[in-house]
Amino acid sequence: PMDIEWAKDGITGDLFIVQARPETVHANSSASEIMRYTMSAELINDLRRSGKLLATGQAVGKRIGTGRVRMYESYDEVIRRKRAVQKRLAEGELEEDLLLDERVFEQGDVLVTEMTTPDWEPLMKKSGLIITRKGGRTSHAAIIAREFGIPAIVGCTGAMRVLEPLMEVTGSCAEGDE
């Protein structure tokens, strides 16, 4: 199997292959792999009573991710926030153990952004869930999520409007394509 990116000429209608590569981990993974999730009856009842659907998009993978929302408009914002925290730490304004601040991305956090590029990969590898406003099954976010076995929801147009920094969310890719 191959991941093939193509472009269509808007005037002539001609199709062009712009990139082709062997499919990443998805094709190589065992079709018989089963992920098992267990929730207590109390948690299930709580979710049924209070849980609500915040946004939808295209599911990538078959896993469920949960964590604190870390929202970024662009990768430049990631760099600016990281530098601000490093400066405050160096100046003694922040304690090392107080890095729950919304500017710091921690292992298992939920990455929420417009779209990803290769610059995002260090954060993506640490993510418990990736949510992008733009993209589809062949987008950078989807390919990297499959490669690292991280659940992702791409093309989730409402995410940046309804999610808030540090909000605890759960995203399920185990229930189908959307």
Predicted features and spans:
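ATP-dependent carboxylate activation and anion-phosphoryl transfer catalytic cores
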Residues: P1-S50
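Acidic, glycine-rich flexible loop/linker segments
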Residues: I11-T12, V18, P22-A27, A59-F105, ...
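Hydrophobic cores of alpha-helical transmembrane segments in multi-pass integral membrane proteins
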Residues: L54-G57
